[in-house]
Amino acid sequence: IEQPTFPKITEMCVKMIRRVNDEEGIKKLVNETFQKLWFTPTPHHDKEAMTRKILNITDVVAACRDTGYDWFEQLLQNLLKSEEDASYKPVKKACTQLVDNLVEHILKYEESLSDSDNKGVNSGRLVACITTLFLFSKIRPQLMVKHAMTMQPYLTTKCSTQNDFMVICNVAKILELVVPLMEHPSETFLATIEEDLMKLIIKYGMTVVQHCVSCLGAVVNKVTQNYKFVWACFNRYYGALSKLKNQHQEDPNSTILTANKPALLRSLFTVGALCRHFDFDQEDFKGNSKVNIKDKVLELLMYFTKHSDEENYFLCFPPLGFAFIQHPSLMFEQEVKTLYNSILSDKNCSVNLKIQVLKNLQTYLQEEDTRMQQADRDWKKVAKQEDLKEMGDISSGMSSSIMQLYLKQVLEAFFHTQSSVRHFALNVIALTLNQGLIHPVQCVPYLIAMGTDPEPSMRNKADQQLVEIDKKYAGFIHMKAVAGMKMSYQVQQAINTCPKDPVRGFRHDESSNALCSHLYSMIRGNRQHRRAFLISLLNLFDDTA
């Protein structure tokens, strides 16, 4: 604040802001620091201070491009929540100023992009500004409503660089959140957005398709109800897949799937993405037809998992995951259960395939969580006297049944040599536990084992889950401590890259901590638990027992 031109400010901000989820004292300090630095209204005449603030925020957002933006969302939420009931709302006012000025800066950078000398720099700045606007939209979409029409033309950006693609994806994400909040948007504006999105879906790759279909879902489902437009697109790609399937069935030895690989992959992905955001079994889409679209789509996708080369086989899984988000009941189908469980339990199966199946489960759980939170908010608005808990239990029944089906195989993925597989398995288990979909006792030994992982982020996540379980169910941890120790040894065996080296129970770093130090610290506070644990360990070495 005192030295606004100091060159290390961005670096300092990045380091501070990452502490936003630390213990209460540090969290409070971080919130106060950034409230002073960024979220205090700036006098209108002080353009220089405003520009400095914008550059500082966008520099920090750009610097965190690879590590994710959770911290920014958390910070914004903390600050806006703290003044919800206050009559004077300085943070809200500052956010409005920042959003308005970010839009001004975007228009300025766009003008200067025609100046070839600074193209790279300004293109990077443009992406950072639009990304920052998306982060604001995620927490307070109302701030962007008046700027929606300014953002729409960016959907027609000509894509030649990575930055161009990022602009399109972020603009699509902003419009997805903002357009449904607009009061009486013009027909022309909505039709233009639909046309622009459809052109992008037909022309570009997976990431663009995913974000544009998601945006189209919000615009069509919540605003225009232009179902015929989407139905035509679905039929185009569904028809292409059906045709390829029929040709392949007539002559299974033909090279038709290989020869039409690009069309096959685009059709698979687009059909999956559309099924995620639209329920084509609604009368609005298929009219009076008795055909069950979701079953037909599943049949098609499963056909290509059985008759594809390795790359095509792998690329059948993202669309399957998309279809299961809209229709979770499909995960109870016997062939889906067999397929998923065989991939998760097969030791020789490719790492990428295991990760994709775990990602599918993770995305389903995340979407389900978002859906339930939204349902909770809607109910609170409509009828405060209703029993929300009961409603949550009904809608989470399906998720609970699904996770029971795949739980064992997901937990066994903790014993994989690749850290990326363990990472996604832990994410799925954390989401499952946070939503209360399974009884936590069955996960305790596995979480103890994951607490010995060499990667700090995974260790901390597993340890945090154990702390939460211990708060709710005292005694569960010590009850499963010995089983957890045995599994810890299995995890260490799996990740031991040099089989000749013996497995050690401590970290080979400057701390030389015991791998199970977190478990010991949780048990040592209770004398009874401590003694029972030590006796159980000693009994393992008792020949007479």
What kind of region is each of these model predictions?
Residues 118-119, 287-288, 395-397, 432-434:
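Short secondary-structure boundary micro-motifs
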Residues 63-64, 68-332, 342-345:
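Alpha-solenoid helical-repeat scaffolds
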